[in-house]
Amino acid sequence: MAIKAEEISALLRSQIENYESEMSVTDVGTVLQIGDGIALIHGLNDVMAGELVEFHNGVLGLAQNLEESNVGVVILGPYTGITEGDEVKRTGRIMEVPVGEELIGRVVNPLGQPIDGQGPINTTKTRPVEKKATGVMDRKSVDEPLQTGIKAIDALVPIGRGQRELIIGDRQTGKTTIAIDTILNQKDQGTICIYVAIGQKDSTVRANVEKLRQAGALDYTIVVAASASEPSPLLYIAPYSGVTMGEEFMFNGKHVLIVYDDLTKQAAAYRELSLLLRRPPGREAYPGDVFYLHSRLLERAAKLNDDLGGGSITALPIIETQAGDISAYVPTNVISITDGQIFLQSDLFFSGVRPAINAGQSVSRVGGSAQIKAMKKVAGTLRLDLASYRELESFAQFGSDLDEFTASKLERGKRTVEVLKQDQNKPLPVEHQVLIIYALTKGYLDDIPVVDITRFEDELNHWAESNATELLNEIRETGGLPDAEKFDTAINEFKKSFSKSE
């Protein structure tokens, strides 16, 4: 049989073309020391800051301290299977998390892996966790309202899309409740919500997820959970993972609301990491860059200009104080970074004023320009009225013989406090808020006993739904304040049918 040279060369050519070299060159190091979620690695001379490295058992680590003789790596997972002398490989990748629509309705860990038992997440797109914040020229000033559904906030400390508004207060004062209520109020508003739970009990996270599911809010919400039992590197990374998922939507022209619950625990996790990495401690044993830890996170919340699609990320960071001390290190840092704060007071909470917002110390530095005209007009004097009531209240304790003007101020103040009370998980549409605040400021509640105020409001809302729909629709659709005559007619009509308690 004759051997044909063409056939042999064609065969060889196809073999060469299909040949795949299995050999790859990777930078390899050795574990010198391991413990408390930190590994010291020798030999990774070319590793980048923030690069992922892979241990022999598949667990990933994050390169943090780049020193002459070794690299300090924080381990993103269980470290019990890693021992001294183990091999460590560079991956050449910085940390990334999956992003996209597929994450909506899911509960994931800070690495973007599902932890809700509902199967894998089929997304192919990823984004780097650490990213420079949007530049000044790509932004636009805050001018669209983000309605929380909470009267005391929408009237006194309004929030706009693209704003960073801090929620600060002692433990058990209703901080998470405000955040969850705000998420519930975004239903049908076209806002995607991201709830980042940092260092909370698993049972607490589960309860919040169930609350969102029952209200139908998981249809537009992503939950990123790093519970108290997770290693501290995951608690440190969780907020950055959350905002990275949010940026994907923002750059596609959508509106995002992100809640960090809470950044005090993230700062504590970062302090733990820094001390284990032998970085020099500063005030309250925090490292020197704890301000940068939060500023680079919160600066990623923005309102993009119209050329970039006009998307936004609104951030609601939560900070827990000790005994109301807002002058501690982390609270003062975050207050200076954000565009205002909602200060919750335990004294108010325990006296039955819920949400326990201290109107005097709560501010919104940019939200005023985003507030709808109707609310701005009816709630204009509300803060001053509340402040003068608090002042008169303490003054009135010393004597009962008050002049008529002071007595009327006190009575109006009591009704103002009652109107601003609200049950949890019951956000109120803005048109109903405008209606009750108008009734309050125009004196329609002055002859209603204080004990009846809540019932008056509930019944007014039900009555208005069927008898004053035009009025409510006008506020909802235009944002402007209808004629006073329409309000007066509606409220007077309702008062005829309202029965006061004896």
Swiss-Prot record:
<keyword id="KW-0066">ATP synthesis</keyword>
<feature type="binding site">
    <location>
        <begin position="169"/>
        <end position="176"/>
    </location>
    <ligand>
        <name>ATP</name>
    </ligand>
</feature>
<dbReference type="InterPro" id="IPR005294">
    <property type="entry name" value="ATP_synth_F1_asu"/>
</dbReference>
<dbReference type="InterPro" id="IPR004100">
    <property type="entry name" value="ATPase_F1/V1/A1_a/bsu_N"/>
</dbReference>
<dbReference type="GO" id="GO:0005524">
    <property type="term" value="F:ATP binding"/>
</dbReference>
<keyword id="KW-0813">Transport</keyword>
<keyword id="KW-0406">Ion transport</keyword>
<feature type="site" description="Required for activity">
    <location>
        <position position="362"/>
    </location>
</feature>
<comment type="similarity">
    <text>Belongs to the ATPase alpha/beta chains family.</text>
</comment>
<dbReference type="Pfam" id="PF02874">
    <property type="entry name" value="ATP-synt_ab_N"/>
</dbReference>
<dbReference type="GO" id="GO:0045259">
    <property type="term" value="C:proton-transporting ATP synthase complex"/>
</dbReference>
<keyword id="KW-1278">Translocase</keyword>
<comment type="function">
    <text>Produces ATP from ADP in the presence of a proton gradient across the membrane. The alpha chain is a regulatory subunit.</text>
</comment>
<keyword id="KW-0375">Hydrogen ion transport</keyword>
<keyword id="KW-0067">ATP-binding</keyword>
<dbReference type="InterPro" id="IPR036121">
    <property type="entry name" value="ATPase_F1/V1/A1_a/bsu_N_sf"/>
</dbReference>
<protein>
    <recommendedName>
        <fullName>ATP synthase subunit alpha</fullName>
        <ecNumber>7.1.2.2</ecNumber>
    </recommendedName>
</protein>
<dbReference type="Pfam" id="PF00006">
    <property type="entry name" value="ATP-synt_ab"/>
</dbReference>
<dbReference type="InterPro" id="IPR027417">
    <property type="entry name" value="P-loop_NTPase"/>
</dbReference>
<dbReference type="InterPro" id="IPR023366">
    <property type="entry name" value="ATP_synth_asu-like_sf"/>
</dbReference>
<dbReference type="Pfam" id="PF00306">
    <property type="entry name" value="ATP-synt_ab_C"/>
</dbReference>
<keyword id="KW-0472">Membrane</keyword>
<comment type="subunit">
    <text>F-type ATPases have 2 components, CF(1) - the catalytic core - and CF(0) - the membrane proton channel. CF(1) has five subunits: alpha(3), beta(3), gamma(1), delta(1), epsilon(1). CF(0) has three main subunits: a(1), b(2) and c(9-12). The alpha and beta chains form an alternating ring which encloses part of the gamma chain. CF(1) is attached to CF(0) by a central stalk formed by the gamma and epsilon chains, while a peripheral stalk is formed by the delta and b chains.</text>
</comment>
<dbReference type="InterPro" id="IPR038376">
    <property type="entry name" value="ATP_synth_asu_C_sf"/>
</dbReference>
<dbReference type="InterPro" id="IPR000194">
    <property type="entry name" value="ATPase_F1/V1/A1_a/bsu_nucl-bd"/>
</dbReference>
<dbReference type="InterPro" id="IPR020003">
    <property type="entry name" value="ATPase_a/bsu_AS"/>
</dbReference>
<dbReference type="GO" id="GO:0005886">
    <property type="term" value="C:plasma membrane"/>
</dbReference>
<dbReference type="GO" id="GO:0046933">
    <property type="term" value="F:proton-transporting ATP synthase activity, rotational mechanism"/>
</dbReference>
<dbReference type="GO" id="GO:0015986">
    <property type="term" value="P:proton motive force-driven ATP synthesis"/>
</dbReference>
<keyword id="KW-1003">Cell membrane</keyword>
<dbReference type="InterPro" id="IPR033732">
    <property type="entry name" value="ATP_synth_F1_a_nt-bd_dom"/>
</dbReference>
<dbReference type="GO" id="GO:0043531">
    <property type="term" value="F:ADP binding"/>
</dbReference>
<keyword id="KW-0139">CF(1)</keyword>
<dbReference type="InterPro" id="IPR000793">
    <property type="entry name" value="ATP_synth_asu_C"/>
</dbReference>
<keyword id="KW-0547">Nucleotide-binding</keyword>
